[in-house]
């Protein structure tokens, strides 16, 4: 059975754990670099990316997560996870640099501009995925190595590159497990 960690420093950790378990994998909370040992994949949940980065640096998680990815292990970042995984963050904040694109934080606006949207995802077919966007980022300037999986208003809101999957929205806040299934079946 696949073992998936969830970075447990902020965000919808329990919701990701429930989604992982409902998709048939084992879920574990990751708070220290040693917690990455033996995992097949890792989820970076939403939250506030600047705060998450500061906590990750304080607990010396940045380099171990980069090493985890360089071993070919899969990482799925949602919302702030997308921001942290991007090669660059608009404004120059440090990132993990694991997907070749630039993240625009709060790209759709602040909390009051949060919204839901139907996404047509070719890999899923019908019905459309009902995505929840909360202070959502998006990606710009992807390299040719990045596959765009979904857009809203011509803005990239889901993408993958090699073993890295990112969404600007929160699939863990829905009852639709297709993104986690995709991660487990195609990436891990």
Swiss-Prot record:
The active site is at 79 (nucleophile), 170 (charge relay system), 172 (charge relay system). Pfam families: SNO. L-glutamine binds at residues 47-49, 105, 134-135. Signal peptide: none annotated. The keyword Calcium does not apply. The keyword Metal-binding does not apply. Keywords: Glutamine amidotransferase, Hydrolase, Lyase, Pyridoxal phosphate. Pathway: Cofactor biosynthesis; pyridoxal 5'-phosphate biosynthesis. Its EC number is 4.3.3.6, 3.5.1.2. GO terms for molecular function: glutaminase activity; pyridoxal 5'-phosphate synthase (glutamine hydrolysing) activity. GO terms for biological process: glutamine catabolic process; pyridoxal phosphate biosynthetic process; pyridoxine metabolic process. It catalyses: aldehydo-D-ribose 5-phosphate + D-glyceraldehyde 3-phosphate + L-glutamine = pyridoxal 5'-phosphate + L-glutamate + phosphate + 3 H2O + H(+); L-glutamine + H2O = L-glutamate + NH4(+). One of its GO terms (cellular component) is cytosol. NCBIfam families: PLP_synth_Pdx2 (TIGR03800). Belongs to the glutaminase PdxT/SNO family. In the presence of PdxS, forms a dodecamer of heterodimers. Only shows activity in the heterodimer. Catalyzes the hydrolysis of glutamine to glutamate and ammonia as part of the biosynthesis of pyridoxal 5'-phosphate. The resulting ammonia molecule is channeled to the active site of PdxS. This is Pyridoxal 5'-phosphate synthase subunit PdxT. It comes from Listeria monocytogenes serotype 4b (strain F2365).
